[in-house]
């Protein structure tokens, strides 16, 4: 697949590594990756979309080839939304786009999908395994009071969030992973042995932990009411071992034009079932 690459400077002087794929005259898809991935994780899906769309991907700050901020607060959700704005203003200036995001890419993209300034440009948002932290906080409070079983079920899936708050544990642990070792873990989760290697896994894992530290406690303790400014599709992965599908049940509270589609897949379906994910993206946008 042909691609072009760019460097985009952010509002706080970081550098983001951006790629574009396909014919620039086609409708635009912006794909945002999660943790501990980089933009390469989207390539299997891109192969099924590139004939029909102009695709923009980028390494979020701290991942892949992009620069690594020194301070945790540089990973806060409002700054991540500004990063998306910097990318689209640079690569597709004044054009509208469809946003698709997975895992932490989706969590951070909710900040933009509920931001009024994107209303005229963001045509739709497809979220995969990444809830809005504000919505999740309201949901967990309600579940704790009314449905403790659901509350503790999600809590058991989110054990790693607490571990990532420890100052040195998570960065140190990632030093012991190699690309092949991480690939074996993904293969066990997804039931496939042909998944691509992430050659940046040590750095992506080590630095991306700041996403959790900068955002989870502030958002879960002081959630904001955030309403979507565009149609939203939630691709719900029924076998997801990290995000409970029940988190999606309350989404119509926050999204006026909402669509839900269930897929029998685990968390990294964008790698293990790219053709299915691409089909659902096409169907929605």
Each model region followed by its residue ranges:
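The conserved beta1-alpha1 loop
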Residues: 30-34, 102, 236
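Conserved HGGG/HGGXW glycine-rich cap/lid loop of the alpha/beta-hydrolase fold
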Residues: 19-65
